[in-house]
Amino acid sequence: MIRIIKFYDECREFASSFQGDPNFSDPMLSDEEQVNCNLINAIDRTDRYVLGVYQDAAMIGLFTFLVLRDEQYIEMLVGLSRDKEAYLEVLRYLEQCYPGYSADFVFNPGNYLLKEFLDLRNAEYEPEQQKMVLGTPVLGIDTTGVELFSEQYTEQYCTLHNKDMYWTGEKVVQAKDRFRTFLAIHDNKVIGYMDVTYTFKENEPFDLFVLEEYRRKGYGRKLLAKALEMNQPNGMMLLVDADNDPAIRLYESMGFTKVQGQNNLTAHWSVPEN
């Protein structure tokens, strides 16, 4: 049985029992800010649903979903269970309530139960992500050629931007209350960009890109350096492909360190039409 959670006390003990679990802990609940955003405060949000899955009177699963009806989009913000029946029931719930929606799942790579059911539904996966957090930032790096986004570059930026993601260039431009965007400019041409949040105690780059012909010329380092400079005194975390050694070395050289046990995996699933 699935029931909407109305008070945090209904699920507090259940959620706490997953802390430190190597397979079933949730990378979206890795700190107090994420717990507040993705679980506690989500209970009162109209665009988020916190669902408890019960067997008899016992909770066997806890899930939070962001639901954007106008865009027919769902994102799992929390997924906690050690019981295959909970995953099966919540996926059936999505199939019943949100046919035709696009659904994203961000979860622990060790969660073989959820992955098994997503595999059966032909979900597509992004590469496993390594979490890194900022220790002492390396500041004072030359950032010539990098500047904050301005409207004169809107068309170039949106054309260059990765289209295969939720936060496209157009959406980032409209979300000035959430993102700062830094642009790498060469001869008045946008050759790279970095989108990064700025309203949190621990902010996060969402996308970093430099045109192929301008790579290995220091633009990626300059973009990151400018973002770190303007992020002071806040912290920063990021996710990088776990096998992308050059990018990991870049981030380590700028003051980031790997966080063990908090990698994540993202799956994309198209909920079938009825």
Spans of features found by a protein language model:
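Conserved donor-binding loop and adjoining core beta-sheet/short helix segment
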Residues: 33-90, 194-206, 212
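Conserved acetyl-CoA-binding loop-helix of GNAT-fold acetyltransferases
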Residues: 82-96, 210, 216-230, 248-253
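Conserved active-site alpha-helix within GNAT-family acetyltransferase domains
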Residues: 109-127, 221, 243-261
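Conserved hydrophobic beta-strand within the GNAT/NAT acetyltransferase core sheet
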Residues: 103-107, 205, 236-240
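Short hydrophobic/aromatic beta-strand element in the GNAT-like acyltransferase core
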Residues: 48-52, 62, 115, 129, ...
